[in-house]
Amino acid sequence: MLLGRIMLPLLLVLAACLPDHSSGRKEGAHMVSDKPVRVGLVLSHFGLGDQSFNDMQYNGLIEAYRRFDIHTVFRVPRSEADTDMRPVFDELIHREQCNVLIAGEGFQMGPLVYELAKKYPDVYFIVFEYKAGVLPNVINAEFAQNEGSYVAGFLAARFSVTKKIAFMGGVDIAVIKDFEAGFRQGMQRGEPSCQLVTEFVSRLPDYSGFYDPKKGYEMASRLYKEGADIIYAVAGGTGNGVIQAAREAGKYVIGVDSNQDHMAPGQVLTSMMKRLDVAVLRLIEMRIAGTLRGGVYRFDYKNGGVSLTEMEYTKKMFSEPLLRELRTLEKQMADGVITVINTLKG
């Protein structure tokens, strides 16, 4: 296994603040029963510096370390193969003695998490957006990406000049389709005449669509040439290529997961943030308090689990009436006034 390779200067600084306390209990460490809380995070093999899913979770871990002074450690497997992921989890359980494990990539780590949870009932496993039954020590963290996408779709439809907007999904899995459904519904509210073109970078069982910025760039360049003036890129690291294409074409993109507005100031209209950092911090805090139980925890507009950015570089591009509408829409979303399609609801 590999320690996370940090690709951004900021993350280099943050990593220096996250020592590996493998020698045992720290003075003043927070306790659960008679054991100190020890948290291990397994990121996807793409590692740190993705400006997306991995970085958000890592930031939450950093904040938990700073606030609670607990043992924290992260690892990055060489690949998504079971033969590479399993030893990482084993190391965190046995050598690091972690009693809270966060699986940073639910759709690929989920099956292994459920297997290990049955074997180690005293370890709490947090997995994002993957559910295969109910276990007392498995925490399923879900996000209302449909709600955030609805608001993003409304904004895109009101801002688009060509009235042709594209949705680029990394892989055709259920959670990505939930993004698309909310985005489409929001577009319809914003401007019913808008056309939405939906494409996926890869299809199951191929997950490379989340880690292929070159293909994202090529697809986005084509979509812009075909008349789309905004692309909602829900594709992990592949979205970095979409942002590059927007920059070169003079078009617009909506980022996802983390705040990507700075990656092309003035052309990333906003980012629909799934606050994995908030989720990681809150769930660790609950474990420290002894209130964490197995089950589903949903992070939505109401509790700060999803939101648009402050649009630092683009707010001046929107009219004041549109910004007022957007603020009203966000309040309605938080208050539960708006019902958004949820394609994941069983």
Predicted regions and their residues:
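Intrinsically disordered, low-complexity regions enriched in serine, threonine, proline
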Residues: 2, 22-23
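Sec-dependent signal peptide recognition
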Residues: 2-9
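Hydrophobic h-region of N-terminal signal peptides that target proteins for export
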Residues: 11-18
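Intrinsically disordered and other compositionally biased segments
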Residues: 9-10, 282
